[in-house]
């Protein structure tokens, strides 16, 4: 049964025009919410989809998670393929996309592994817009064998080489691939995982079109974390990197 929607779009939306993005308001239009841990603000895929694709284009999100990108693609009249290894995530995605509106795109949801999306032909996708897990910082399942959120950083980066190769294979020449990645800290030192992923995609053949800093608003320097930041002499990570790659 389709949901009753009270608000279809964000208020006073303007396309971002610089390389620092900050969205204190998570976004509560359509079916969006912040209940899926680690999901990105809908302002991010909205900006990316509007800037790097056209109505009727085919968009791919192979780490679909809570379904934010699916909802935005449908609202913006793009067709989208959403993939995830997690059946719970896919069920949530189906619920989130269960609405009707004129001039909406179609949503295709499929269980699958981002390292092998062979059901998609070569050079068939117009835009890739995705938000992978950051290794095992947040684990999204307990026992799914192909879940990359179970992997430690070195193993995760090795598997992301396969993801990058598949992205390059399915994306049309001249089109764009956008990926949000974060870093982590281990034993008191920064692990620049995002830049490792950037290099992996460059090695796969992509050119870096944009490097955007995205501010995190769930990282409050209060209480427990503020105390430990001072006590153990480390800074709280309050940003992520949004890479936009170009397939020439």
Model-derived features: positions:
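Class I S-adenosyl-L-methionine-dependent methyltransferase catalytic core
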Residues: 1-248
């Amino acid at each position: 049964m389709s949901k009753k929607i009270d608000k279809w779009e964000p208020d006073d939306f303007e396309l971002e025009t610089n390389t620092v993005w900050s969205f204190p308001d998570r976004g509560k239009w359509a079916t969006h919410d912040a209940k899926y841990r680690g999901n990105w603000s809908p302002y991010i895929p909205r900006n990316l989809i509007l800037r790097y694709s056209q109505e009727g284009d085919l968009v791919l999100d192979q780490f679909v998670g809570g379904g934010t990108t699916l909802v935005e693609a449908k609202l913006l009249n793009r067709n989208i393929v959403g993939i995830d290894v997690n059946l719970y995530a896919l069920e949530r995605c189906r619920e989130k996309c269960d609405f009707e509106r004129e001039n909406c795109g179609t949503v295709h949801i499929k269980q699958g592994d981002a390292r092998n999306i062979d059901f998609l032909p070569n050079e068939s996708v117009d835009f890739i817009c995705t938000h992978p897990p950051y290794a095992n910082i947040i684990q999204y399942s307990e026992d799914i064998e192909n879940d990359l959120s179970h992997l430690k950083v070195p193993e995760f980066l090795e598997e992301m080489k396969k993801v990058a190769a598949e992205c390059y294979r399915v994306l049309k020449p001249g089109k764009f691939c956008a990926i949000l990645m974060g870093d982590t800290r281990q034993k008191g030192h920064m692990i620049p995982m995002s830049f490792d992923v950037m290099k992996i995609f460059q090695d796969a053949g992509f050119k870096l079109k944009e490097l955007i800093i995205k501010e995190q608003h769930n990282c409050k320097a209060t209480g427990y974390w503020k105390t430990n930041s001072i006590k153990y002499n480390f800074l709280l990570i309050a940003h992520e990197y949004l890479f936009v790659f170009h397939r020439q």
